[in-house]
Amino acid sequence: MTYAYLFKYIIIGDTGVGKSCLLLQFTDKRFQPVHDLTIGVEFGARMVNIDGKQIKLQIWDTAGQESFRSITRSYYRGAAGALLVYDITRRETFNHLTSWLEDARQHSSSNMVIMLIGNKSDLESRRDVKREEGEAFAREHGLIFMETSAKTACNVEEAFINTAKEIYRKIQQGLFDVHNEANGIKIGPQQSISTSVGPSASQRNSRDIGSNSGCC
């Protein structure tokens, strides 16, 4: 299937926060309760519709172990979007967000869109990180924020698509050089219009990116 743009994503965060499960739920609409640890990187892709345009999302799921951090860093380059994931039942995964964020911003484009995800919202009774803490971290660092459940699929679709909406908004504003694939964006065969157009009504509508969305 042809597409207007290809956006490259990277999923980052500690081991066991559910990165691979989020990818599987988004691409295959299924949950795998037992998942082998990611070694290096895994890959998935899916087409979505943003503002009437077909967008191909190319998603790289990275290993969370410290021993693979150098490999992960190489994938930041050329990523238009990042999903930074923590587990709401494990505070240490939230405490490590600053380190992951520093890595991401040091090795990526300054315009990369970062979505902060508090995963495993289905385990409310075991919650160790308040939603308000995630919201505050996102505000402080200029991130989009959502809580998700890879198990129930709650907000999984929205997290990936809202990240794409924000990337597309930046394209419309001229913040991304879409002719430089190092920015994680590739022009597809569908896309022939100039990317230097100003904000449109549809673009302005896309700014409602759901940072306050509830879960289930």
Swiss-Prot record:
Residues at which GDP binds: 16-21, 119, 122, 150-151
Cofactor requirement? Mg(2+)
Gene name tied to this protein: RAB2B
The UniProt function text for this chain reads: The small GTPases Rab are key regulators of intracellular membrane trafficking, from the formation of transport vesicles to their fusion with membranes. Rabs cycle between active GTP-bound and inactive GDP-bound states. In their active state, drive transport of vesicular carriers from donor organelles to acceptor organelles to regulate the membrane traffic that maintains organelle identity and morphology. Regulates the compacted morphology of the Golgi. Promotes cytosolic DNA-induced innate immune responses.
Q: What is its EC number?
A: 3.6.5.2
Does this entry carry the keyword Phosphoprotein? yes
Q: What class of enzyme is it?
A: hydrolase
Protein name, per record = Ras-related protein Rab-2B
Q: Which residues bind Mg(2+)?
A: 20, 38, 61
- Organism whose genome encodes this protein: Homo sapiens
User: What lineage does UniProt assign to this protein's organism?
Assistant: Eukaryota, Metazoa, Chordata, Craniata, Vertebrata
Cellular component per GO? acrosomal vesicle; autophagosome membrane; endoplasmic reticulum membrane; extracellular exosome; Golgi apparatus; Golgi membrane; plasma membrane
**Could you tell me the superkingdom of the organism this chain comes from?**
Eukaryota
Oligomeric form and interacting partners: Interacts (in GTP-bound form) with GARIN4 (via N-terminus). Interacts (in GTP-bound form) with GARIN5A. Interacts (in GTP-bound form) with GARIN1B. Interacts with VPS39 and VPS41.
